[in-house]
Amino acid sequence: MALEQALLSWVHITSAAIWVGGSLLIGAVFAPILKKMSMSAEERLQLMIKVGRRFNKIAVPALIILIVTGMYQAHLVLQKSDILYDTSYGNILIIKIILVVALIVTYAVHVRIIRKDVEDQIITNQISEHQLQKLRKKIIILGEITVVLSVIILFLAALLNSGGEI
């Protein structure tokens, strides 16, 4: 049982490292460098979309694994329903679940904004400068929200791992 729990925790933590680490790398390292490059706004956005699509190939499976392993771990702890509502551990877990749902919704909207037809419009210069700036702003804001939610969820996971006492 201890080995099973250790493996489960390892998979969960590795998936969190991929999701949160990759998101931070894109937001805190790649985006600022890209902003200072002498490319056009369209070229920068095209490159960011390509990087995002590539990242999604590993990030989405990592997020799915995080959700599944997190639900399983919560199920193990919550053998009694009163733990969820009558303890600080349960309260932290409820907050974490709400933030995970908010993260999934935010991420889905973020990905939906950059659909294939929008990407094709950018590549073929069929999008106005005004639309491009609006799109960039939405992408940046949703990306920032995703990163902030991810970091907060990671902190809540650390609190839960330490026993859920504040």
Where are the language model's segments positioned?
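Polytopic transmembrane helical bundles with strong interfacial aromatic enrichment
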Residues: 1-166
